[in-house]
Amino acid sequence: MLQPSRRKYRKEQKGRNTGLASRGTHVSFGEFGLKATGRGRLTARQIEAARRAINRHIKRGGRIWIRIFPDKPISQKPAEVRMGNGKGNPEYWVAEIQPGKVLYEMEGVSEELAREAFRLAAAKLPISTTFVARHIGA
């Protein structure tokens, strides 16, 4: 699964996920893309589950790009531990997603196959998404 190899700090503050995506909003590498229309957090496991769903559907054809990376650690306290006594340990990694961000891209397959593969992938994700195609000349 995806996670950073090393970081300056182990833990990060919660923060707020606001605004629209300003970078990574266009299909840059492939012909078709899966774009987020909602906001939220995608865990490394969810990103991997969606990638597997896409790969299973397109079989050996085509090429896939993952345009997001889980670089934010989420900490949790163990079960049945009293409040206080510091922040919990980092348990998993998430990517903060804003509306407009392209999550996955694909090329080398027909549009129908790409649509179906992205539909299966979107079912694994907790945010709403839409299918987008590259605009030639844009």
Swiss-Prot record:
It comes from the Bacteria. The keyword RNA-binding applies. GO terms for cellular component: cytosolic large ribosomal subunit. Disulfide bonds: none annotated. Residues 1-24 are annotated as: Disordered. The keyword RNA-binding applies. Residues 1-13 have a biased composition (Basic residues). One of its GO terms (biological process) is translation. Pfam families: Ribosomal_L16 (PF00252). GO terms for molecular function: rRNA binding; structural constituent of ribosome; tRNA binding. Keywords: Ribonucleoprotein, Ribosomal protein, RNA-binding, rRNA-binding, tRNA-binding. Belongs to the universal ribosomal protein uL16 family. Part of the 50S ribosomal subunit. Binds 23S rRNA and is also seen to make contacts with the A and possibly P site tRNAs. This is Large ribosomal subunit protein uL16. It comes from Bordetella pertussis (strain Tohama I / ATCC BAA-589 / NCTC 13251).
